[in-house]
Design a protein with these regions (language model features):
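Beta-strand-loop-alpha-helix segment that lines the small-molecule cofactor/substrate pocket
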Residues: 1-29, 44
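A short beta-to-alpha transition loop/helix N-cap that caps and shapes the active-site region
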Residues: 4-6, 58-64, 111-114, 155-156, ...
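Hydrophobic alpha-helical segments typical of transmembrane helices
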Residues: 7, 87-91, 218
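Short beta-strand segments
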Residues: 25, 53-54, 103-104, 133, ...
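C-terminal glycine/acidic-rich active-site capping loop/insertion
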Residues: 115-116, 122-123, 130, 137-141, ...
Length: 219
């Protein structure tokens, strides 16, 4: 992931010169309950999908006293789109299909932060809030309306929530864990009879070993 195609080309050039492999770590594609969600969508358990809503409201940058760093700079790729949005938009593409119409609103709520080891304040140019309205094209004839809300300044926010509503039922994948972005997910399914079920991942999606820190491994 980069902020320009020229940077991607430069990374590819450097990797080839040094005989290195380059990949993007969209780790949520390996998290068991995300794999379970993908399986259920592909099995058409929800029927025609009417609405997708993805909220990712985290508080990692909610303290205005947190030091200024590269994350505060738009030109360095800082901001909630780079931190959360890249994963959110990859999820939507993976689960449902291509996003073809996008409109949005960005905001910088905390406009200055203290420099490290200093009381001096420096400008913040990167966004800490993003709202997006999206139309997704998939196998069905109808475009799927989708709404995305991202925030890194939502202290005690609701965390991650993906709601999928269809003609035959709904799925809700969520986690309120503010300390670990990978652990703590749960998945609920309800059909047209309004029976809500807590779902677990198929054993084939689980890993033999897990780590307590979700940054080390996606399970």
């Amino acid at each position: 992931v980069s902020i320009s195609s020229s940077e991607i080309e430069e990374l590819q050039r450097i990797s080839l010169i040094n005989n290195l492999s380059v990949c993007v770590d969209f780790e949520y594609r390996a998290v068991p309950l995300f794999l379970q969600t993908k399986k259920l969508i592909d099995e058409n358990i929800l029927g025609d999908i009417y609405l997708v809503k993805l909220d990712w409201l985290m508080g990692s940058r909610s303290d205005p006293k947190r030091s200024w760093n590269w994350y505060s700079l738009e030109e360095k790729g800082g901001g909630v789109i780079g931190a959360l949005g890249t994963h959110a938009f990859d999820m939507l593409n993976w689960f449902f299909g291509e996003s073809i119409n996008v409109s949005g609103k960005l905001a910088t709520s905390i406009k200055k932060r203290p420099l490290p080891n200093s009381s001096d304040l420096n400008d913040v140019t990167s966004e800490d809030v993003c709202f997006a309205n999206i139309e997704i094209s998939n196998y069905s004839s109808n475009l799927i309306p989708c709404q995305v809300s991202l925030s890194s300044i939502s202290k005690n926010g609701r965390g991650f929530s993906l709601e999928i509503y269809g003609s035959e039922g709904s799925l809700i994948l969520k986690s309120e864990n503010q300390k670990d972005y990978v652990h703590g997910f749960n998945l609920k399914y309800s059909n047209n009879e309004n029976k809500i079920q807590n779902l677990t991942a198929d054993s084939s999606f689980n890993f033999e070993k897990t780590w307590t820190d979700g940054r080390i491994a996606p399970v």
